């Protein structure tokens, strides 16, 4: 039984039922119970049409090993992390996040919301599950429903000053995903007029894919911001762990800009603290951290690296350009909703439009991530390194090369034969020129002039 197609670097993900189905989920549940070696495991699920059957199979697999299940029912991924942290239990989330409706998947964590990835247990779980039905036990663990939504809402609200927040108008698009479960009860506790698009939980995602990183999927949100004169717009992905903002003019707020805003807010509360950012964040992020008296720590791309470095260094916050935001006081786990609530608090306190509040952080022009299919990613990276040898290189993750006025990072995908390129420059003109120059080398068509 070969499960390598669905076991990825950080989770399990595949097309239902061809790649992931109740039979496989049952075995994976039993395998996780054996590997985690805990008396109880928390289980949550998103609203995909296949999630109830996969949840039933996971419960069967887990309880067959005489392990009890704390069944959260519907959950966002960050609600599941809260359950794992507050109850001190290993946990499984059934979700395929922003993937199309035909997909589903599983995210795992250990007690205290500690990450489980390819190098921290996922490969062991895969090996156990590949034993097939022999991993299924004959035990009879109990299943206990548990509703943690109210406790989770209280937890999220601790990250901002609710009492002194001024009235705001907020547009939210949860894309029929799990944000429809967690966003309304949080916003109901704030002085917010909420315009909520696609709030209903619907695993067919009838309005648009639950993937806000694609600009096409933010069109309705941006129209709502302008139509209602909203102070801010928020787009959540399918399992509601990532958030993307737009300002009152319906202009994008990049993950780096929101990281800088949240970092500044956190450093006001804890001066001198350490803050983690990944290496494709804007130059603005470490600059803002230093300007506010903090210590920036640069990491590889990927949530397991951020969480590991936060745990090792005691950092209070970590941000990724991809829309993930991690908090020490949230068990080092990520929560788009906590980041959104902190942003609302800062917007309220500033008494300015969001575009003005963010102007000091919008310092550079960025390309966004550009993917290029290549036959040999590593050989291509070496060709790029040679072509741009006049810059300042580092190899923390792929290849980063810095110049005085611009920088780029190129790194291979974990799962496909492609390279991911990010470029940033001091001006739009320089960005355009240098992006084309790097792409020409990647595509084997040129070298820098």
Task: Report each predicted region and the residues it spans.
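An N-terminal, well-structured beta->alpha segment
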Residues: 1-60, 64-66, 145-168
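Short glycine-rich phosphate-binding loop at a beta-alpha junction
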Residues: 40-46, 70, 169-171, 273-279, ...
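N-terminal small/polar loop signature for handling phosphorylated ligands or for N-terminal nucleophile
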Residues: 41-104, 157, 185-246
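Active-site nucleophile and cofactor-binding loops and adjacent substrate-binding regions
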Residues: 69-78, 252-255, 277-278, 299-300
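Glycine-rich phosphate-binding loop
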Residues: 91-103, 225-247, 252, 295-335
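Gly/Ser/Thr-enriched, mixed-charge loops and adjacent short helices
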Residues: 104-228
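Phosphate-binding and adjacent anionic-ligand microenvironments
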Residues: 268-449
């Amino acid at each position: 039984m070969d499960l390598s197609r669905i076991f990825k670097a950080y989770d399990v993900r595949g097309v239902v039922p061809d790649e992931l189905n109740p039979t496989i989920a049952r075995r994976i549940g039993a395998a996780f119970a054996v590997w985690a070696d805990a008396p109880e495991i928390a289980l949550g699920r998103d609203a995909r049409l296949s999630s109830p059957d996969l949840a039933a199979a996971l419960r069967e697999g887990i309880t067959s090993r005489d392990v009890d299940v704390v069944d959260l029912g519907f959950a966002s991924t960050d609600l599941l992390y809260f359950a794992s942290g507050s109850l001190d239990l290993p946990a499984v989330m059934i979700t395929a996040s922003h993937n199309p409706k035909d997909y589903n998947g599983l995210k795992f964590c250990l007690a205290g919301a500690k990450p489980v990835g390819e190098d921290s247990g996922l490969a062991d779980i895969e090996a156990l599950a590949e034993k097939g039905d022999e991993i299924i036990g004959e035990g009879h663990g109990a299943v206990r429903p548990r509703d943690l939504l109210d406790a989770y809402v209280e937890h999220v609200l601790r990250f901002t000053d609710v009492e002194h927040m001024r009235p705001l108008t907020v547009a939210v698009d949860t894309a029929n995903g799990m944000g429809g479960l967690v966003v309304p009860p949080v916003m109901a506790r704030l002085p917010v007029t909420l315009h909520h698009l696609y709030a209903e939980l619907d695993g067919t995602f009838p309005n648009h894919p639950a993937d806000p990183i694609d600009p096409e999927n933010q069109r309705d949100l941006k129209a709502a911001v302008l139509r209602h004169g909203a102070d801010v717009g928020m787009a959540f992905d399918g399992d509601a762990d990532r958030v993307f903002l737009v300002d009152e003019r319906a202009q994008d707020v990049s993950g780096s800009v929101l990281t800088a805003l949240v970092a500044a807010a956190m450093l006001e509360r804890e001066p001198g603290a350490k803050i983690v950012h990944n290496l494709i964040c804007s130059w603005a992020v470490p600059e803002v951290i230093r300007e506010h008296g903090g210590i920036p720590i640069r990491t590889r791309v990927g949530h397991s690296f951020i969480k590991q470095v936060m745990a090792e260094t005691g950092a209070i916050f970590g941000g990724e350009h991809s829309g993930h935001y991690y908090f020490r006081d949230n068990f080092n786990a990520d929560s788009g909703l906590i980041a959104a609530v902190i942003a609302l608090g800062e917007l309220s306190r500033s008494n300015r439009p969001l575009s003005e509040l963010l102007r000091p952080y919008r310092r550079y022009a960025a390309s966004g991530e550009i993917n290029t299919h290549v036959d040999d990613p590593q050989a291509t990276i070496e060709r790029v390194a040679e072509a741009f040898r006049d810059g300042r290189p580092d190899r923390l993750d792929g290849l980063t090369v810095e110049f005085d006025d611009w920088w780029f990072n190129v790194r291979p995908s974990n799962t496909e034969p492609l390279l991911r390129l990010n470029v940033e420059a001091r001006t739009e003109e320089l960005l355009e020129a240098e992006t084309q120059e790097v792409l020409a080398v990647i595509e084997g068509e040129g070298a820098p002039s």
